[in-house]
Amino acid sequence: MNIGEASKTSGVSSKMIRYYEQIGLISPALRTESSYRTYGDNDVHTLRFVRRARDLGFSVEQIKELLALWRDRSRASSDVKAVALEHIAELERKIAAIQEMTRTLKHLAGHCHGDDRPDCPIIEEIANGSAQVNMEVNPRFGVAALK
Protein backbone atom coordinates (compact mmCIF):
# COMPACT_ATOMS: atom_id res chain seq x y z
CA MET A 1 0.00 0.00 0.00
CA ASN A 2 1.14 3.58 -0.57
CA ILE A 3 1.82 6.12 2.17
CA GLY A 4 -1.71 7.54 2.04
CA GLU A 5 -3.24 4.11 2.55
CA ALA A 6 -0.75 3.30 5.32
CA SER A 7 -1.63 6.61 6.95
CA LYS A 8 -5.36 5.95 6.81
CA THR A 9 -5.00 2.36 8.05
CA SER A 10 -2.58 3.19 10.89
CA GLY A 11 -3.97 6.53 11.99
CA VAL A 12 -0.54 8.16 11.57
CA SER A 13 -0.30 11.11 9.17
CA SER A 14 1.84 10.80 6.06
CA LYS A 15 4.01 13.62 7.34
CA MET A 16 4.64 11.78 10.62
CA ILE A 17 5.38 8.53 8.80
CA ARG A 18 8.09 10.32 6.81
CA TYR A 19 9.40 11.92 10.00
CA TYR A 20 9.52 8.59 11.84
CA GLU A 21 11.49 7.14 8.93
CA GLN A 22 13.86 10.13 8.93
CA ILE A 23 14.67 9.80 12.65
CA GLY A 24 14.98 6.02 12.46
CA LEU A 25 11.96 5.22 14.59
CA ILE A 26 10.64 2.98 11.81
CA SER A 27 12.50 1.28 8.99
CA PRO A 28 12.62 3.11 5.67
CA ALA A 29 9.81 2.04 3.37
CA LEU A 30 10.42 -0.05 0.32
CA ARG A 31 10.26 1.97 -2.89
CA THR A 32 8.58 1.27 -6.19
CA GLU A 33 10.43 1.78 -9.47
CA SER A 34 8.96 5.28 -9.54
CA SER A 35 10.28 5.93 -5.98
CA TYR A 36 6.92 5.81 -4.22
CA ARG A 37 6.98 4.43 -0.70
CA THR A 38 5.22 1.11 -0.18
CA TYR A 39 4.14 -0.37 3.12
CA GLY A 40 3.08 -3.82 4.20
CA ASP A 41 0.93 -5.10 7.03
CA ASN A 42 3.92 -5.32 9.38
CA ASP A 43 4.76 -1.67 8.71
CA VAL A 44 1.19 -0.64 9.50
CA HIS A 45 1.24 -2.74 12.68
CA THR A 46 4.44 -0.95 13.73
CA LEU A 47 2.89 2.44 12.94
CA ARG A 48 -0.13 1.57 15.09
CA PHE A 49 2.23 0.59 17.91
CA VAL A 50 4.02 3.93 17.59
CA ARG A 51 0.73 5.85 17.46
CA ARG A 52 -0.57 4.13 20.59
CA ALA A 53 2.70 4.76 22.43
CA ARG A 54 2.53 8.45 21.43
CA ASP A 55 -1.10 8.56 22.59
CA LEU A 56 0.14 7.36 25.98
CA GLY A 57 2.68 10.19 26.02
CA PHE A 58 5.87 8.19 25.55
CA SER A 59 8.80 10.13 24.10
CA VAL A 60 10.45 9.16 20.83
CA GLU A 61 13.40 7.70 22.75
CA GLN A 62 11.07 5.67 24.96
CA ILE A 63 9.19 4.45 21.87
CA LYS A 64 12.49 3.34 20.31
CA GLU A 65 13.17 1.37 23.47
CA LEU A 66 9.65 -0.09 23.52
CA LEU A 67 9.89 -1.05 19.83
CA ALA A 68 13.17 -2.86 20.48
CA LEU A 69 11.58 -4.70 23.40
CA TRP A 70 8.48 -5.51 21.34
CA ARG A 71 10.61 -7.03 18.59
CA ASP A 72 12.78 -8.97 21.05
CA ARG A 73 10.84 -12.15 21.76
CA SER A 74 13.35 -13.04 24.49
CA ARG A 75 12.73 -9.78 26.37
CA ALA A 76 12.04 -9.73 30.07
CA SER A 77 8.70 -8.19 30.96
CA SER A 78 10.51 -6.43 33.80
CA ASP A 79 12.33 -4.33 31.19
CA VAL A 80 9.03 -3.23 29.66
CA LYS A 81 7.60 -2.54 33.11
CA ALA A 82 10.63 -0.40 33.99
CA VAL A 83 10.02 1.82 30.94
CA ALA A 84 6.34 2.13 31.86
CA LEU A 85 7.06 2.94 35.51
CA GLU A 86 9.61 5.58 34.51
CA HIS A 87 6.99 7.14 32.25
CA ILE A 88 4.37 7.03 35.01
CA ALA A 89 6.79 8.90 37.30
CA GLU A 90 7.28 11.56 34.58
CA LEU A 91 3.52 11.91 34.16
CA GLU A 92 3.06 12.29 37.91
CA ARG A 93 5.72 15.03 38.02
CA LYS A 94 3.93 16.83 35.18
CA ILE A 95 0.58 16.50 36.94
CA ALA A 96 2.07 17.94 40.14
CA ALA A 97 3.58 20.87 38.23
CA ILE A 98 0.31 21.58 36.42
CA GLN A 99 -1.54 21.48 39.74
CA GLU A 100 0.97 23.96 41.17
CA MET A 101 0.52 26.27 38.17
CA THR A 102 -3.25 26.02 38.60
CA ARG A 103 -3.00 26.92 42.31
CA THR A 104 -0.76 29.88 41.49
CA LEU A 105 -3.08 31.17 38.77
CA LYS A 106 -6.16 30.71 40.96
CA HIS A 107 -4.44 32.68 43.71
CA LEU A 108 -3.46 35.45 41.32
CA ALA A 109 -6.90 35.54 39.68
CA GLY A 110 -8.47 35.73 43.13
CA HIS A 111 -6.45 38.86 43.87
CA CYS A 112 -7.15 40.54 40.54
CA HIS A 113 -10.01 43.04 40.77
CA GLY A 114 -11.09 42.39 37.21
CA ASP A 115 -12.33 45.94 36.77
CA ASP A 116 -11.23 49.03 34.82
CA ARG A 117 -8.12 49.59 36.94
CA PRO A 118 -4.81 48.85 35.22
CA ASP A 119 -3.13 47.17 38.19
CA CYS A 120 -3.38 43.39 38.09
CA PRO A 121 -1.39 40.80 40.06
CA ILE A 122 -1.53 38.38 37.15
CA ILE A 123 0.33 40.78 34.85
CA GLU A 124 2.69 41.79 37.66
CA GLU A 125 3.54 38.14 38.33
CA ILE A 126 4.21 37.44 34.66
CA ALA A 127 6.34 40.58 34.36
CA ASN A 128 8.28 40.07 37.59
CA GLY A 129 8.29 36.29 37.85
CA SER A 130 8.01 36.29 41.62
CA ALA A 131 6.00 33.05 41.97
CA GLN A 132 8.12 29.93 41.78
CA VAL A 133 6.81 27.03 39.72
CA ASN A 134 8.80 23.80 39.64
CA MET A 135 9.52 23.84 35.90
CA GLU A 136 12.53 23.93 33.62
CA VAL A 137 12.85 25.20 30.08
CA ASN A 138 12.23 22.74 27.27
CA PRO A 139 14.06 24.06 24.17
CA ARG A 140 11.27 22.89 21.86
CA PHE A 141 8.22 24.07 23.79
CA GLY A 142 9.47 26.65 26.27
CA VAL A 143 8.53 26.05 29.87
CA ALA A 144 7.18 22.52 29.77
CA ALA A 145 9.75 19.99 30.91
CA LEU A 146 9.43 19.10 34.54
CA LYS A 147 12.05 18.67 37.21
Swiss-Prot record:
Name listed for the protein in its UniProt record? Heavy metal-dependent transcription regulator 2
Q: Which UniProt keywords apply?
A: Copper, Cytoplasm, DNA-binding, Plasmid, Transcription, Transcription regulation
The record's domain comment reads: It contains a N-terminal DNA binding region and a C-terminal metal binding region.
| GO terms under biological process | positive regulation of DNA-templated transcription
Q: Which NCBIfam families match?
A: CueR
Known Pfam families for this protein? MerR (PF00376), MerR-DNA-bind (PF09278)
Source species of the chain? Rhizobium meliloti (strain 1021) (Ensifer meliloti)
Q: Function, please?
A: Transcriptional regulator involved in acid tolerance. Binds copper.
Q: Does the keyword Metal-binding apply?
A: no
